Amino acid sequence: MSNLRKTHPIMKIINHTFIDLPAPSNISAWWNFGSLLGICLIMQILTGLFLAMHYTADTTTAFSSVAHICRDVNYGWLIRNLHANGASMFFMCLFLHIGRGIYYGSYLYKETWNIGVILLLTVMATAFVGYVLPWGQMSFWGATVITNLLSAIPYIGATLVEWIWGGFSVDKATLTRFFAFHFILPFIITALVLVHLLFLHETGSNNPSGINPDSDKIPFHPYYTIKDALGLMFMLFILLLLTLFTPDMLSDPDNFSPANPLNTPPHIKPEWYFLFAYAILRSIPNKLGGVLALLASILILLAMPLLHTSNQRSMMFRPISQTLFWILTANLLILTWIGGQPVEEPYIIIGQVASISYFLLIIVLMPMAGLFENFMLKPKW
């Protein structure tokens, strides 16, 4: 009798994806984040589903329904805090996953990379609409400020904003539709993840050396299942540490006050994972320019394959590119810090310098470093 794992139509797909998948023998812990992101997504969908059972998407009861979840629902506090901090873990893994892709040249698998960028945008949209749901001060004003950015679009901007709001301000209609979006988007993300994996398995995984690994492959199970399980233990440890000891460390104190359209918080800022983009948005005094820079800061990832000038795929043996990569990482950390600071000197100028540096590094310096490294590696005799 033939093995069911290799013959059954559904088991066969699972087998080719997680068990008998040929994987490079030298992929490091940086390749763990794909599976961690998958687990984060499952966890967010499950905790979100249980939250949705008790949440009411109405401006008069939304805030108190979240309080009710934390006070009266069995383990509601745990589900809510796992969901909120799970989003932070999701973005942490996402940023590390993208960083790995840039460092090791994974973006040269263009279809996989492009679907990945679409996934990033979808996850960001999901997180944004989700942040509005508790209907606290920062939820309300964050929604007002970010949706208002669309009014910078010439001619149709104002109409577009009112269309998204469902009225003349962020109100009941906005909250209801944002809840609908927040519920449907994770399932769209799941579908996109399957497409992402489909394209990845067309080519196989990249590896730290950037050299074609076809001559040296090992089965995914048991080697990488056990390795991914170790990564999962680490991630769950950090998540539980956050959730059980400092559940509100990454949230804004203003969001513990119910939304009040008559009282603006002193500093409107998004969650930490959007601060880098928010800093770029704020660093340009012009509204439309800021919105375009905000979009460009994410969409520039789509240009990564076009900006690759090196003869080598990975940065593993390219010290100049490595240096620029870590400068870019530090630059993003500076932008994240600036995004959380008030709009005053010296933060304004630091934000502007960091924003210019961000685009300069990706568009000019890193491609130039690739060309210079090619030149240095040419035989001189």
From Swiss-Prot:
Which positions in this protein are listed as binding heme b b566? H97, H196
- Which residues does heme b b562 bind? H83, H182
Keyword set for this entry? Electron transport, Heme, Iron, Membrane, Metal-binding, Mitochondrion, Mitochondrion inner membrane, Respiratory chain, Transmembrane, Transmembrane helix, Transport, Ubiquinone
- Consequence of mutating T17M? In strain: Isolate CD11
Q: How does it sit in the membrane?
A: Multi-pass membrane protein
- Give the UniProt entry's GO cellular component terms: mitochondrial inner membrane; respiratory chain complex III
Assign the protein's first listed, main location to one coarse class. Answer: mitochondrion
User: Outcome of mutating A229V, per the record?
Assistant: In strain: Isolate CD11
The protein's matches in SUPFAM superfamilies, at most eight in alphabetical order, are given as:
a domain/subunit of cytochrome bc1 complex (Ubiquinol-cytochrome c reductase), Transmembrane di-heme cytochromes
Q: Which cofactor does it need?
A: heme b
Record text on cofactor binding? Binds 2 heme b groups non-covalently.
Q: Which domain of life is it from?
A: Eukaryota
Protein location: Mitochondrion inner membrane
A molecular function (GO) term: ubiquinol-cytochrome-c reductase activity
Q: Does the keyword RNA-binding apply?
A: no
Q: Where are the transmembrane segments?
A: 33-53, 77-98, 113-133, 178-198, 226-246, 288-308, 320-340, 347-367
Q: What else is known?
A: Heme 1 (or BL or b562) is low-potential and absorbs at about 562 nm, and heme 2 (or BH or b566) is high-potential and absorbs at about 566 nm.
Assembly and partners are described as: The cytochrome bc1 complex contains 11 subunits: 3 respiratory subunits (MT-CYB, CYC1 and UQCRFS1), 2 core proteins (UQCRC1 and UQCRC2) and 6 low-molecular weight proteins (UQCRH/QCR6, UQCRB/QCR7, UQCRQ/QCR8, UQCR10/QCR9, UQCR11/QCR10 and a cleavage product of UQCRFS1). This cytochrome bc1 complex then forms a dimer.
Similarity comment: family membership: Belongs to the cytochrome b family.
Task: Output this protein's name.
Answer: Cytochrome b
Native source organism of the sequence: Trichosurus caninus (Mountain brushtail possum)
| Gene from which the chain derives | MT-CYB
